Regions:
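Short glycine/acidic-enriched loop and turn motifs that connect beta-strands
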Residues: 41, 84-90, 148-152, 200-201, ...
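Conserved beta-propeller blade signature
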Residues: 32-35, 78-82, 141-145, 190-195, ...
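Extracytoplasmic beta-rich repeat domains
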Residues: 2-29, 54-73, 82-87, 93-96, ...
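A detector of repeated loop/turn-to-beta-strand junctions in beta-rich toroidal repeat architectures
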Residues: 20, 39, 94-96, 153-154, ...
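Acidic/polar residues in short coil/turn loops that connect beta-strands
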Residues: 28-29, 39, 74, 85, ...
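Blade-level signature of beta-propeller repeat domains, shared across WD40, Kelch, NHL, RCC1
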Residues: 218-248
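Short loop/turn segments that connect beta-strands within beta-propeller blades
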Residues: 1, 46-50, 103-106, 161-164, ...
């Protein structure tokens, strides 16, 4: 097979101090891929023709991969995505980051909500982790992990209603996190969220209420997203260790 390159230009360029390029994974649906870049673009590309179908301004640099879900009632695909706080930070290194629900066919913004964040030189705040889509008793929610909100060291996990964009619950975290939230389920379908943070904590939360059910500390910053198989969680830390943890 031949290697195909797709080139593009935007109104934001390196001369405006924006960095061009992509640091997150694409998501795909049918014969389209959806990808974010460092200059605040979310783009839909037809992979059969390599043509740009649409581009949506999502305001800032996105390090989080977009996630896509098809509404079973309508058959319409939607994308959930957010950004870091980078180019849009003010002189005090603070600002609002957006969370979007976007129509995958048209690029239309269905809803948008914002959260105030902090950033420091070289280490931006905002959403650095991919959102978590869920099922069973958690259906109707999407989870975002927000770094450096409520203070430079703090964070927040939020559960958002997918239809309205309203916040269902939020949990303030003493330490910010870059790890993506992961959903796990009991045999009867009750959902829980696992979230790791920059102080080495692994939290287990009730996905319906946000109540923290348990926390263990693994010693060092956890930037990786845990992998879960049956009742075993596996995750690596900045302490050069890989842990296996049993869910009970």
């Amino acid at each position: 097979a031949d290697i195909v390159k797709w080139n593009y230009t935007t109104s934001r360029t390196g001369t405006d101090t924006y960095w061009l390029g992509m640091e997150s994974s694409a998501c795909a649906y049918d014969h389209y891929i959806y990808v974010c870049d460092n200059s605040g673009d979310l783009m839909c590309i037809d992979i059969n023709t390599m043509e740009l179908i649409w581009s949506q301004d999502i305001v800032d640099d996105s390090n989080a991969s977009p996630v896509l879900e098809v509404d079973p009632a309508t058959g319409t695909a939607y994308i959930y995505v957010s950004t870091s706080l980078h180019w849009t930070a003010n002189k005090k290194k603070s600002g609002d980051i957006p969370i979007f629900k976007i129509n995958a066919a048209t690029g239309e913004i269905m809803w948008k909500r914002t959260y105030e964040c902090k950033t420091v030189d070289g280490i931006s705040g905002g959403v650095q982790a991919t959102a978590c889509l869920v099922e069973n008793n958690l259906s109707g929610l999407v989870y975002f992990n927000i770094a450096r909100t409520g203070g430079k060291k703090h964070g927040k996990l939020v559960a958002i209603d997918k239809k309205t964009g309203g916040e269902v619950w939020s949990v303030d975290l003493k330490y910010y996190s870059w790890s993506s939230p992961v959903a796990v389920y009991t045999s009867n379908g009750d959902g829980y969220i696992i979230l790791c943070d920059s102080d080495g904590n692994m939290h287990l939360l009730d996905g319906k209420t946000g109540v923290v059910k348990d926390t263990i500390n693994l010693g060092k910053n956890i930037e990786a997203t845990p992998a879960v198989f049956n009742n075993t969680i596996v995750v690596g830390t900045r302490g050069k260790k890989i842990y296996g943890i049993t869910l009970k």
